Structure formats: structure tokens, C-alpha cells
């Protein structure tokens, strides 16, 4: 007996199947979204410090209000001196 036949036979299972499917889809979507973020390090051998290559002018959040980025001159001098 297939899953659709079982759902049509027991109609009370339809909402349960819907909510379980929606929860699984949401969890999978969030996991993929979280793995694409720049603060997640999966391979430390090839790129040990991925946060150094993040573009500061590009917002990292879903919603950013009035973000302006200006480089801190002292920090830039320290970065150039340590390289």
C-alpha cells in the first residue's frame, strides 16, 4: 500500500504528514543556509581564516538597515604590518 493510498484511507493523517514535511523542508533549508554563511569553516586546511576574505561592504545579514562601513585606519596599518 503506497503512502498516498494510506493517506486517502486515513484522512486524519493528512495534516500530520503536511506538518512533518514542512518541518523537514524548513530544517533542510536552514541547514543549507547556515552552511553557506561565511563564519562556518568546513575545510580548515585550505582556508584557515575565511573571515579575512569577507567583503565588508556587502551586508552579511538578511536585513541590514543603514549600514555604512568605513575602514579604521589604525586597524589597516596593523594588518599591513603583520603580513
UniProtKB/Swiss-Prot annotation:
Coiled coil: none
Gene Ontology CC: one annotated term: nucleus
Cellular localisation: Nucleus
GO biological process: response to bacterium
Primary subcellular site in the record, as a coarse category: nucleus
Keywords of this entry: Nucleus
Entry superkingdom: Eukaryota
InterPro entries hit by this protein: B12D
Family matches, as PANTHER family: NADH-UBIQUINONE OXIDOREDUCTASE MLRQ SUBUNIT, NORMAL MUCOSA OF ESOPHAGUS-SPECIFIC GENE 1 PROTEIN
Similarity comment: Belongs to the complex I NDUFA4 subunit family.
Protein name: Normal mucosa of esophagus-specific gene 1 protein
